[in-house]
Amino acid sequence: MNSVNSIRSTFLDYFHLNGHKVLSSSPLVPRNDPTLMFTNAGMVQFKNVFTGLEQRPCKQATTAQKCVRVGGKHNDLDNVGYTARHHTFFEMLGNFSFSDYFKEEAIFLSWNLLTKEFCLPKDKLLVTVYHSDDVAAELWRKISNLSDEKIVRIATVDNFWAMGETGPCGPCSEIFYDHGDEIWGGPPGSANEGGDRFIEIWNLVFMQYEQVSKEERVELPHPSIDTGMGLERIAAVLQGVHDNYDIDLFRALIGASQEITGVEATGDFIASHRVISDHLRSCAFLIADGVLPSNEGRGYVLRRIMRRAMRHAHFLGVKEPLMWRLLPVLVREMGQAYPELVRAESLISETLKLEEMRFRKTLERGLGLLNEASSNLKEGDHFNGEIAFKLYDTYGFPLDLTQDALRCRGISVDVDAFDKAMQRQKTEARANWSGSGEAVTETIWFAVRDRVGATEFLGYEIEKAEGIITALICDGKVVDHISSGQKAIIVVNQTPFYGESGGQIGDSGIISSGCFVFEVHDTQKKSNGVFIHIGEVKSGQAKTFECVELTVDVVRRQKIRANHSATHLLHEALRQILGPHVTQKGSLVLPDRLRFDFSHPKSVSSEELKKIEDLANDIVLQNSEVTTHLMALDDAISEGAMALFGEKYGDEVRVVSMGNPLEPEGLKKRWSIELCGGTHVERTGDIGLIHIVSESSVAAGVRRIEALTGTAARLYFNRQDERIREISSLLKTVPADVGERVSNLLHEYNRLSQACIELRKKIILSGNTIKNNQEDITIINGISFMGRVVRNILPRDLKALVDDGKKQIGSGVVAFISVAENGKGSAVVGVTNDLTDKLNAVNLIHILSDVLGGKGGGGRPDMAQSGGPEGDKAVGALAALRASLEKI
């Protein structure tokens, strides 16, 4: 069978046999392209190759690239589930030539694969060429024997590809498949080309020009090839179906969705099952590549996708988290091709489950409000954009969910009104905000770099060096000298000072000459390679182009080194104890402590923290050598080095290795191997000791540990030991017995506290606590009523009193009001079960709440609570309740 997995393998094997190097898919978050939110095409990882900024050892490559298209020019989100071919996540199969073969070979390779390997009927295929590309048209005739009617010339920009306003560009040739005349639609270039009969399955881009300016385009001396074939589309063709959602992969996901929900994928429910299956793929792969749900950037897009799927799960009647239950099916179907899914399965599962649980209340409330606000609308109407904004701003219900929920009823949202409301809020927010007054901009560092070049870093080998001052900055301006007492920035041609980056704080120390002393408080490394030394002139006057001596604070740096090396050991220990899904999400390396943020869906238990700490300290005790090597990025990754998500790496990287494996770990020769530009200890024993002092949550799916090393850890234990001795002295016991002694005291305290509570309840229920209480129990309209005012009783204890009161009267109503020291009143009303058919505690509590100045209240028919600021009206509140019972 032509399964998705076999088609992918056939494609890659075919091009491998034809001289192409098979390369892995790049992550969904582009490593070196800030212009893209997500990887959306196969050529993204080769962008710098095509522009000449990067060289690859191979001239021909082939990939199966995972892609996400949501937002910007390529935004398929709103259409997903309602068409046969739109997806948020898809795979793009591609072959690439970097200044090697060109049009003839590209056309031959594509035609041969489709007709010989995939055995597609030639009469089902037709192609397009750019209207002026006579060479491509002639090559198609020669290679395929297609008639002129099957080689369609297209004059629109759709058949001419450009990377941007400038850069490589060229004509395209698209290959279409004819699904048959039973499906409406015409061939490309016709009036009915928007139909679904003729579907593009492959696009060949002939990069033969460079766009120099808007008016000028020149021939490239060495043209290239970039092609892209949608795997889901070709799978539909080869499996004999017209709809992408009918291929084996989606059949498996939708089948599982039907089984779990108990709802067939028919009628109005088809789109929901499709949305869930598609969105599961994009969510799972984004999480596997390090994106976690948040309220900004990529994390916000992920959250939008997840919540759209949740809305459709809600439409299917699902009351519990669904997507995580479908994940094992996705891993089974795609895990072999993409092992990152297997590695991150537990993280993906927990993230999906937690996000769905968090959003469920918002979803239910938002849909309820939306249904209420749109109840009078009919098909073709517009929903008020101001109300849509209120749903978003007040209740956290996103616009796209409002649109999606109304779409099935044929109702659109007034987006212009929504945007105006959003803009009005932003304008008001800006009016209430005042800036920081920061005068220095980043442009100054580019000017310095252009004038004097980047700073050479010497600090891996030495901590003292000589250099020449190349720039002085004071009050945000470049100056030629600085004097005693001035706070300023010094730039030197070379420095041993480490500039803050990769989470490691910058060095401090002294820059001096015979004429001045400058105290460096911090060192920063700017993105263009300029190191800036921030500090204050302590004496004398410094001038540009003066020869100086730079001396790093060695003691401080040693502490930083120990903490940085400890983060590497903790990172690996976290992965070994919690699982390979753990990846670094942030770090802070200071002289006195370290902080490490990592991906993990739930809190780390005390037992797990102890195992992590013990494992890291085992490597410290090895006292093994810490080594650094420069090597090619691909070689480093193949040797097991961990690349940090979101970091940009060049062709050559610095690899830091430490520790010997505690057990055989395949080809991995060192315990921890990471790409890192920071400073580290010479041997793991130099760390001394690692102690984790806290574990907490940073964001959904991100945890944080803080730790101490060396002297800081020793001092921490000394302080703890001193505290234990002080406590043991107070408890009149030895330190070893402190735990048992405290446990006994707590047990006795709890026993006495409970005894006090029971005694107080007896006193209150006896009716002798406050003068204004009515005597015992009164009968009103045949209903027994106990109403009392008490002092300083907590709400939870007040409930217990009401329960006891209900037992005491057997049948009737019990109302207690507790007046606190601050004058506020807390009220609880109880109704015995035999009376709840005619008396509701929620209605009765509202009477008390109104008198106490409160806002309603809530609960069950047999028990409700409320309160208010006017506790001095407690007696009047009980009187109002009695009066109400008299009217029944």
From Swiss-Prot:
Molecular function in Gene Ontology: alanine-tRNA ligase activity; aminoacyl-tRNA deacylase activity; ATP binding; tRNA binding; zinc ion binding
GO biological process, alphabetically ordered: alanyl-tRNA aminoacylation; negative regulation of DNA-templated transcription
Swiss-Prot/TrEMBL cofactor(s): Zn(2+)
GO cellular component, one term: cytosol
EC number: 6.1.1.7
One family name in Pfam for this protein: tRNA_SAD
Cross-referenced SUPFAM superfamilies: Class II aaRS and biotin synthetases, Putative anticodon-binding domain of alanyl-tRNA synthetase (AlaRS), ThrRS/AlaRS common domain, Translation proteins
Reactions the enzyme catalyzes: tRNA(Ala) + L-alanine + ATP = L-alanyl-tRNA(Ala) + AMP + diphosphate
Alphabetic keyword roster: Aminoacyl-tRNA synthetase, ATP-binding, Cytoplasm, Ligase, Metal-binding, Nucleotide-binding, Protein biosynthesis, RNA-binding, tRNA-binding, Zinc
Record localization: Cytoplasm
Binding-site list for Zn(2+): H564, H568, C676, H680
Cofactor, free-text remark: Binds 1 zinc ion per subunit.
Top-level lineage group: Bacteria
InterPro entries in the record: aa-tRNA-synth_II/BPL/LPL (IPR045864), Ala-tRNA-lgiase_IIc (IPR002318), Ala-tRNA-ligase_IIc_anticod-bd (IPR018162), Ala-tRNA-synth_IIc_core (IPR018165), Ala-tRNA-synth_IIc_N (IPR018164), Ala-tRNA_ligase (IPR050058), Ala_tRNA_ligase_euk/bac (IPR023033), DHHA1_dom (IPR003156)
Location, primary (coarse class): cytoplasm
Functional summary from the UniProt entry: Catalyzes the attachment of alanine to tRNA(Ala) in a two-step reaction: alanine is first activated by ATP to form Ala-AMP and then transferred to the acceptor end of tRNA(Ala). Also edits incorrectly charged Ser-tRNA(Ala) and Gly-tRNA(Ala) via its editing domain.
Family according to the record: Belongs to the class-II aminoacyl-tRNA synthetase family.
Domain notes: Consists of three domains; the N-terminal catalytic domain, the editing domain and the C-terminal C-Ala domain. The editing domain removes incorrectly charged amino acids, while the C-Ala domain, along with tRNA(Ala), serves as a bridge to cooperatively bring together the editing and aminoacylation centers thus stimulating deacylation of misacylated tRNAs.
Protein's recorded name: Alanine--tRNA ligase
Species annotation: Bartonella quintana (strain Toulouse)
